[in-house]
Amino acid sequence: MPELGKTLITVPDAAGGAEHAVEVWDADSAQFAARLRKMAKERRKWAARAGVFAYRIYDADLPNYALAVDLYREAETGEAAVHVAEYEAPSHIDEAKAARRLEDALAIIPPALGVPEARV
């Protein structure tokens, strides 16, 4: 059962297999999850063709999720790590709401990209 005030969304894993239930504050976070997954798939194909091991997956594509998400992959092992940077929210956005959106994104990123939480 989700924490009070939170809702469950389903996030497919990076390989397109299992779906993961993720607790979020805003049900609209599903839109961020879908965008992140789509961009990761496109960039993963490009990176494989180009022989690139570090690249940006997401760069504030959606106005409510003002983040940059970069993926770094070990050339030898293929093990990945993700760096997330938050852009400053506009002054008209409530700070608590922006913090909840960041929390939602940080919950979505590990299953969506197939990276352990400790590597985000």
Predicted regions and their residues:
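Generic alpha-helical secondary structure signal
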Residues: 30, 34, 96-103
